[in-house]
A protein has these predicted regions:
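Active-site neighborhood of HAD-like aspartate-dependent phosphohydrolases
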Residues: 1-50
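Asp-based, Mg2+/Mn2+-dependent phosphohydrolase catalytic module
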Residues: 1-9, 116-117, 130-133, 138-238
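Residues at alpha-helix caps and immediate loop-helix transition turns in enzyme cores, especially N-
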Residues: 22-25, 29, 107, 137-138, ...
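Hydrophobic alpha-helical core bundles mediating ligand binding, dimerization, or RNAP-core interactions
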Residues: 26-34, 51-56, 72, 90-98, ...
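A metal-dependent, Asp-based hydrolase signature
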Residues: 45-95
Length: 238
């Protein structure tokens, strides 16, 4: 049962609302991106290496610039490309070809039920997905579980955030953007490292175990956790 103080539920996307096995999804995603970028002179391996380099730079971002600025700065340095030419190509990819990566993900009809059910009960619902993708890439992935950007009061993407998971400052940034206190929020995610970083800001956490990521073998006995369906019961939606 949700604590009476909670007014806002923060949902992770990948592995939480959208079931996936990360390695399979990433391989599919990079394969599609390499096909898109090939006509622009990018060989697959250097392209993937440059994207990873830009992604790692975003993960280390310290709040001094938006994540997209950090990504494009590093990516263009690594490739010698120009953002003004490449950014529209990437955005077009996330609108179109990226839909092919849906095949690497699972179905979750309960995602829409959870978001709509919580909103019907008066909760604010935030999409607290790691902001390493552009907004259009988030929108595309949401569509695979029947949701839209407009279903959330805040969506974290690389355009509007300056930190990433697993930095606790990411959760502080959410609190600033929503005007909420930590005890008013609940973080719902599947990563026992990245999502539990919310605890360092005083935000309670519920871990979804269907696609659980627990690389450090953390003892979950002290945390509320369960399948997505069990979360619905926990939230009073079933």
């Amino acid at each position: 049962m949700l604590d009476p103080q909670i007014t806002t539920v923060l949902f992770d996307l990948d592995g939480t609302l959208l079931p996936m096995e990360v390695e399979h999804f990433t391989k599919t995603y990079f394969g599609l991106l390499a096909q898109k970028a090939a006509p622009y002179g990018f060989a697959p391996e250097p392209l993937v290496a440059a994207v990873w380099k830009g992604t790692k730079a975003m993960v280390k971002n310290d709040g001094t610039m938006t994540n997209d600025r950090r990504f494009w700065e590093v990516f263009c340095q690594a490739t010698g490309g120009e953002e003004s030419l490449l950014r529209p190509v990437f955005d077009g990819f996330y609108q179109q070809e990226f839909h092919g990566a849906k095949a690497a993900c699972g179905e979750n009809p309960l995602a829409k039920q959870a978001v709509e059910g919580l909103k019907a009960k008066g909760y604010d619902v935030v999409l607290a997905t790691n902001p390493i993708f552009p907004r259009v890439g988030v929108e595309t992935r949401l569509s695979w579980v029947g949701l839209t950007l407009e279903d959330f009061s805040l969506v974290t993407s690389y355009e509007n955030f300056t930190t990433c998971k697993l930095n606790p400052a990411y959760y502080a940034e959410i609190l600033r953007n929503t005007g909420k206190q930590p005890q008013e929020c609940l973080m719902v995610g599947n990563d026992a490292v990245e999502d539990t970083a919310a605890l360092e800001q005083g935000i309670p956490v519920y871990l979804i175990t269907d696609c659980l990521l627990n690389p450090q073998g953390r003892d979950l006995s002290g945390l509320p956790h369960g399948s997505f369906r069990e979360f619905l019961a926990f939230a009073g939606l079933e």
